Amino acid sequence: MVVVVDTVSATPIRPRHPEKAARPDSLSPKKPEWIRVRAPTSRGYADTRAIVKENGLVTVCEEAGCPNIGECWDKKHATFMIMGDTCTRACAFCNVKTGMPEALDQAEPEHVAEATFKLGLKHIVITSVDRDDLADGGAAHIAATIRAVRARCPSTTIEILTPDFLRKDGALETVVAAKPDVFNHNLETVPSRYLTVRPGARYFHSIRLLQRVKEIDPTMFTKSGIMVGLGEERHEVLQVMDDLRSADVDFLTIGQYLQPSLKHHAVMRFVTPEEFAGYESVAYSKGFLMVSSSPMTRSSHHAGDNFTKLQAARAALSR
């Protein structure tokens, strides 16, 4: 691994992705018109940013370079990324910083709960970096954060987006026992692309993780998502849908992959809005309760509204 170190600045800054420094640049095609988003400039955006910084929190909105940050933060919606800003994995698609993380902040669960209260969130999304350095992958910390939010904001519904807890026995059970309302774990891509896109993960382990959630608590909503435009074929996307339905997953998200930098995996193709609509139609026909499929779809985009629709869809089935 090549590590690039800043030796010029008075306060040297470690690059976000040292493991990618030696890679050749990967060029992507020009973004089509349907990908354009406005720069974040609203008062709501500024207020959200102030509350996040005041509580010393990290958001995946910023760290992953989410294109929807302006829209979401204007509405005071933010996805908190706990357990630090540094991930132990080095996925080819992800903009989150990689390296050896710092020790967990034991006060973080309370800070997340306080920010949730100040933002007046009715639905909160909590995600995290991968913490392969921890014996439980950070499961106890995630559970503590869920409990802290429940105590401070009892009417707020909680959605978590978790790592895969690969080789972390008992970690999943710890998180499910904390009773989040939605358990989300993203597959990210089709199985054939894992070696180049998500080399530190295992596709069928992730499927089994989602299946296990339903075995532990059949009432818990489960959710997963993939990006398209990474070189996958249509039939592979349809197979992912079948695999997720075999695990009884309720909610599927499909969005366009966007390249964070020239050192990341290239965009192989921009999928058209019509193709996304087609995927949504097929997914509903396969039995998903909720599907969000569009170029700008991201796991946490419109999460609160989508949770309400998810509840309504389940209620309709029981009538």
From Swiss-Prot:
Pathway: Protein modification; protein lipoylation via endogenous pathway; protein N(6)-(lipoyl)lysine from octanoyl-[acyl-carrier-protein]: step 2/2. CDD domains: Radical_SAM (cd01335). One of its GO terms (cellular component) is cytoplasm. Its cofactor is [4Fe-4S] cluster. It is found in: Cytoplasm. The keyword Cytoplasm applies. Keywords: 4Fe-4S, Cytoplasm, Iron, Iron-sulfur, Metal-binding, S-adenosyl-L-methionine, Transferase. InterPro entries: Aldolase_TIM, Elp3/MiaA/NifB-like_rSAM, Lipoyl_synth, rSAM. Binds 2 [4Fe-4S] clusters per subunit. One cluster is coordinated with 3 cysteines and an exchangeable S-adenosyl-L-methionine. [4Fe-4S] cluster 1 binds at C61, C66, C72, S300. The keyword Mitochondrion does not apply. It catalyses: [[Fe-S] cluster scaffold protein carrying a second [4Fe-4S](2+) cluster] + N(6)-octanoyl-L-lysyl-[protein] + 2 oxidized [2Fe-2S]-[ferredoxin] + 2 S-adenosyl-L-methionine + 4 H(+) = [[Fe-S] cluster scaffold protein] + N(6)-[(R)-dihydrolipoyl]-L-lysyl-[protein] + 4 Fe(3+) + 2 hydrogen sulfide + 2 5'-deoxyadenosine + 2 L-methionine + 2 reduced [2Fe-2S]-[ferredoxin]. Residues 73-289 form the Radical SAM core domain. It comes from the Bacteria. Its main location: cytoplasm. Belongs to the radical SAM superfamily. Lipoyl synthase family. This is Lipoyl synthase. It comes from Rhodopseudomonas palustris (strain BisB18).
